[in-house]
Amino acid sequence: KEKRQKNWDSVKSKHSISDIPKVKSAVKNAQIFVRTDPIFDGFSDELEGVLACEPDVVMLPYFKTVREVETFIKAVDGRATTSLLLETGEAAEQIDDIISVGGIDEIHIGLNDLSHSYGKKFLFEELADGTVDRLVERFKADGIKNYGFGGIASLGSGLLPAEMIIPEHYRLGSNCAILSRAFCDVSKVGDIDEIRRIFDEGVSAIRDYEKKCAAMSEQELSENSGALKQRVEEIVSNMQQ
């Protein structure tokens, strides 16, 4: 990822396999989710090291081919829940063949890399132009029940407000999301108590807002989707000026 996103304003984690037990010891009421490196020559050894730590979920990022997914699913061999981070145009264009591999428990659409893969300027363009809708249709048709997309900032923040993004998860039937760096940028917030406060209050606010989204009618969700598309167009237009 460091090579792929060298000049991007993005999160590049420095975690290692040795960090997994440390996280497990600190987490009491949540699943342990580990993202591996993409398939490479030493992938098998890396994955075995990850699985030895007994995570609940293992995610494969930045794959482009059916063969890579086959390698991943076969190597995990039922020892953890499998998650695919779909973030390349190559993978998106052959999603039916990828899903047909079987053994895939969940798929997350990574809008950051995917937007760059398609030559877009703003990561939520794929949400506005129907790309995410088309992928979700394929997930549903092929029996993938657990899926999600993008990142969510705290309420009241983000270039594209979280208040517009969260209803899209409900419209599309998404049941998972990743908190964006804008939710809590730990490179700028160094105090652990402050980080804890941000997460506690921020997640609680999102949960409360989710209740409102769950009660929205189809018309209200559709109207929000239209407003989101218009807002994305405005953002992209401003980027081009």
What are these model-derived regions, one by one?
Residues 1-241:
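Expand to "…catalyze enediolate/carbanion chemistry for C-C bond making/breaking, isomerization
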